[in-house]
């Protein structure tokens, strides 16, 4: 999903917020437009925004997301001359303090926020002075950031709009995973994950002063004794004793599996004893030479010493907890520009403290490889999500007591930290996509009387909680009941009204306004004509004549004032007209705080298929993509490509999954990635390096002098363009080039016949050579070196995409670490720095190994960055044309 604010020039447009601008008009505090309640504690389904730029240069109102026109109405022209009193009274758009514009646009948005999670919602832009197109009709397409009109007047104040986001119950449920109550499922959604991760840790979980997963201890291996047989220490028996694996002991001591057979006998002395008859007898290993590193023991095993050890002796190899969690804690993992912050809250959402992991996001690949060597890919997901979402299962060698440990340092309060296993028994993992209640997300849906006065006890309890002794809201008595002695009921009504007054005052304050922005409220639209009396006749009440308990201050409008308000409302209303135009939303529906909605959904990094297809420009320079009609762009992302290259099906799903896994969480990161792969793949046409058997063999395996001469004679211009010639004449090239290919083959690990073609460049970013395939396979605990597995990197969309994400996250860049050329692991380090040409160049180097196609990569990036991010306008290039749906 791509979404942006209706104004782009400021990070978040300003709401007209001055407390002293309160005026009555249709249940709103005019100029303020507070959500979800305003004047008289009446419902108000949106907010009022001020267009940046002032009167001199106000920014146009823009569509917040791709969508289609449901209804558009130009505003009644504002009279140029100052009206007389009679003219003001006669014109319904002059009300209270001045003119109010009645131009309006309603957009319907259909998008995706996860795999198979399609949602529909509506955005409403009221009080426009003009609309962008007077001839708009229902169904016309509008794209995100397109100007849709200009802000108008609200009661005499210029450059303002009323802005709403609404949806029906079914789509609220698709959007949030539920449509009522708190988040109580045992696990967050797996097909809709984005934003921050939240892990609920139960009470009673062990706390450690150090990370027990990475702690090691010294162990002196017992000297080999040929008379004791099987009781000698073996690599396997030591691993069993310390509840680990031989592979982990080898890794801790810097040895490989291939070295185990020679290393272990030398450690125990078995080798030295066997060589006792040799001419030069090797010395028996000392205690120091028999000392190895073993993992520290923790958990249940720490309390269960082997039969031959006492608990006191066993303790030297264990890590004991320093305490246990005393209550349920919620740990949030939040990443920004490579840094990870772990925020601890209690179940009510109150913040306890936080711990920072500087560059933890950039270094996540290394952490996964070091911590979960059996299957780093599964560990990588555990570190990022607090659970494993993809197909890669954790290796048995990485498990502890049947579970994959996930130790992180967390804050218990402002001054105390400890390590805790965030994947211990009883933990639950969620994401922002689950809209957890501890962040404040609250459903308000108990006001069912259909009027525009807030009669919600849910909302009142949230703003002004009832004291334990306070009676519930009464049904106010009639005159006969008063005569019979209903003084106590009247007193209860007075108390309730006092509570309303306190709640009304609190609702105007910044802290409570922030809290209320997380409410999702079912209320009637304020823009319907035919039910005005039902929604507003309570304004005519007279003090002393059976007042309604939930009226804050009786207004007691007379007939003339009430009719004038009604005429004003009729001039602004549009709901029935929109229904005639095709609007299918019920008058009573769910309202989001629109700015909170946009802010929350901007964290959604899942892109719909339509949004992805737009990233392939309809026209670009010939060496970039050339002409690409909408149908071709759509097919390359969905059905793949089989002409002039091969692109597997369902790349729209595979890339979204990969982006989620490898932290492509911002439009900037995604734009940099697509710019690179579009050039690497020929504008998304191929996932494999082109070339016949001879080309691939002589590039990556072996080149004979005769073949080198043929290349010099027949492909000299190409050799020069690729940088292979380097000014050499024919004899020199023929003499030197075969050796260069031999060295390249050795560096790539291409040591078997046919390895050149077998391990050609494959994937959205090419992995090349046996070693490249092997290391990627070790990351995922999958064999990609045995035929036919190598081809999966190009014919399986999930592997083609995942291998590119792996390349990006694992790439180590060596540079001066200044400006755009940041050094270290993970290309995100450079992608996060900016959107200039120099940034694209800095990313091209680790992806391409040079600067081939740099101009096209920069061209792609500028266009894609416009599509995905909040850039106002298309790049100024005659070669580029925006992709739109036919």
Protein language model regions, located:
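Surface-exposed, glycine-biased beta-strand/turn segments
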Residues: 1-103, 108-115, 136-138, 143-147, ...
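Cell-wall glycan-active module
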Residues: 1-36, 42, 115-116, 166-744, ...
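Extracytoplasmic
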Residues: 44-46, 58, 64, 102, ...
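Active-site rim elements
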Residues: 48, 239, 787-795, 848
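Glycine-rich, acidic and aromatic/proline-enriched surface loops and short helix-turn segments
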Residues: 69, 74-75, 104-114, 621, ...
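Beta-strand/loop nucleic-acid-binding surfaces
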Residues: 122-132
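Active-site loop architecture of trypsin-fold serine endopeptidases
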Residues: 151-162, 166, 255-258
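A structural motif
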Residues: 754-784
């Amino acid at each position: 999903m791509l979404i942006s604010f209706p104004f782009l020039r400021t990070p978040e447009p300003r709401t007209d917020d001055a407390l002293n601008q309160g005026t009555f008009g249709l249940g709103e505090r005019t100029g303020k437009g507070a959500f979800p309640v305003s004047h008289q504690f009446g419902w108000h389904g949106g907010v009022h925004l001020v267009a940046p730029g002032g009167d001199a240069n106000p920014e146009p109102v823009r569509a917040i997301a791709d969508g289609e026109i449901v209804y558009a109405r130009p505003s009644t022209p504002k009279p140029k001359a100052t009206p007389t009193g009679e003219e003001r009274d006669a014109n319904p758009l002059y009300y209270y303090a001045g003119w109010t514009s009645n131009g309006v646009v309603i957009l319907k948005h259909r998008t995706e926020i996860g795999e198979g999670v399609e949602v529909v919602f509506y955005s409403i832009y009221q009080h426009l002075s003009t609309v962008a197109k007077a001839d708009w009709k229902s169904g016309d397409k509008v794209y995100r950031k397109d100007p849709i009109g200009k802000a108008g007047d609200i009661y005499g104040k210029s450059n303002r709009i009323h802005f709403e986001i609404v949806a029906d119950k079914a789509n609220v449920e698709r959007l949030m995973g539920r449509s009522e109550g708190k988040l109580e499922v045992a696990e967050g959604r797996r097909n809709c994950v984005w934003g921050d991760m939240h892990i609920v840790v139960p009470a009673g979980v062990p706390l450690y002063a150090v990370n027990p997963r990475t702690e090691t201890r010294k162990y002196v291996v017992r000297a080999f004794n040929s008379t004791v047989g099987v009781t000698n220490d073996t690599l396997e028996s030591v691993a069993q004793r310390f509840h680990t694996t031989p592979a982990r002991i080898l890794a801790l001591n810097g040895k490989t599996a291939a070295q185990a057979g020679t290393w272990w006998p030398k450690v125990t002395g078995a080798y030295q004893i066997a060589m006792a008859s040799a001419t030069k007898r090797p010395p028996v290993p000392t205690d120091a030479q028999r000392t190895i590193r073993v993992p520290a023991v923790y958990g249940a095993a720490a309390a269960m010493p082997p039969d031959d050890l006492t608990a006191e002796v066993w303790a030297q190899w264990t890590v004991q907890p320093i305490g246990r969690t005393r209550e349920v804690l919620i740990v949030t993992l939040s990443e920004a520009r490579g840094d990870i912050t772990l925020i601890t809250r209690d179940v009510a959402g109150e913040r306890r403290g936080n711990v920072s992991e500087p560059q933890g996001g950039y270094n996540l690949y290394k952490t996964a490889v070091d911590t979960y060597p059996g299957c780093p890919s599964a560990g990588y997901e555990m570190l990022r999500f607090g659970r494993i979402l993809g197909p890669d299962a954790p290796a048995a060698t990485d498990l502890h007591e049947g579970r994959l440990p996930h130790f992180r340092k967390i804050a218990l309060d402002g001054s105390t930290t400890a390590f805790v296993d965030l994947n211990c028994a009883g933990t639950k993992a969620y994401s922002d996509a689950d809209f957890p209640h501890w962040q404040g997300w609250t459903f308000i849906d108990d006001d069912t009387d259909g009027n525009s006065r807030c009669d919600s006890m849910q909302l009142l309890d949230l703003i002004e909680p009832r004291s334990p002794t306070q009676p519930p809201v009464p049904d106010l008595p009639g005159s006969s009941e008063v005569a019979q002695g209903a003084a106590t009921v009247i007193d209860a009504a007075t108390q309730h009204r006092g509570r309303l007054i306190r709640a009304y005052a609190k609702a105007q304050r910044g802290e409570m306004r922030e809290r209320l922005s997380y409410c999702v409220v079912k209320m009637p639209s304020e823009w319907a004509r035919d039910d005005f009396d039902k929604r507003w006749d309570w304004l005519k009440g007279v003090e002393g004549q059976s007042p309604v308990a939930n009226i804050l201050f009786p207004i007691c409008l007379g007939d003339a004032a009430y009719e004038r308000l009604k005429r004003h409302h009729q001039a602004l209303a549009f709901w029935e007209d929109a229904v005639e135009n095709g609007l299918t939303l019920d008058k009573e529906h769910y309202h989001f705080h629109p700015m909170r909605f946009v802010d929350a959904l901007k964290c959604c990094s899942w892109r719909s298929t339509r949004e992805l297809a737009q990233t392939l420009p309809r026209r670009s320079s010939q060496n970039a993509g050339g002409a690409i009609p909408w149908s071709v762009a759509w097919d390359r992302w969905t059905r793949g490509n089989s002409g002039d290259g091969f692109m597997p099906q369902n790349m729209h799903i595979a890339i979204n999954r990969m982006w989620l896994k490898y932290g492509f969480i911002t439009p900037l990161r995604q734009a940099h990635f697509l710019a690179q792969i579009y050039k690497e793949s020929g504008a998304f046409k191929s996932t494999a390096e082109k070339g016949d058997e001879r080309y691939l063999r002589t590039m990556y395996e072996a080149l004979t002098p005769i073949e080198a001469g043929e290349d010099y004679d027949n492909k000299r211009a190409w050799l020069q363009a690729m940088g292979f010639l380097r000014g050499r004449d024919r004899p020199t090239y023929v003499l030197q080039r075969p050796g260069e290919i031999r060295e390249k083959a050795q560096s790539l690990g291409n040591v078997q016949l046919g390895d050149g073609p077998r391990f050609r460049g494959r994937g959205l970013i090419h992995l090349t050579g046996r070693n490249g395939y092997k290391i990627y396979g070790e990351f995922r605990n999958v064999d990609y070196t045995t035929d036919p597995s190598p081809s999966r990197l190009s014919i399986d969309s999930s592997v083609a995409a995942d291998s590119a994400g792996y390349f990006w996250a694992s790439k180590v860049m060596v540079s001066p670490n200044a400006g755009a050329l940041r050094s270290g692991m993970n290309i995100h380090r450079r992608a996060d720095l900016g959107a200039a040409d120099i940034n694209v160049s800095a990313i091209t180097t680790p992806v391409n190994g040079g600067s081939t196609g740099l101009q096209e990569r920069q061209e792609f990036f500028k266009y894609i960055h416009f599509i995905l991010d909040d850039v106002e306008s298309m790049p100024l290039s005659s070669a580029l044309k925006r992709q739109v749906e036919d």
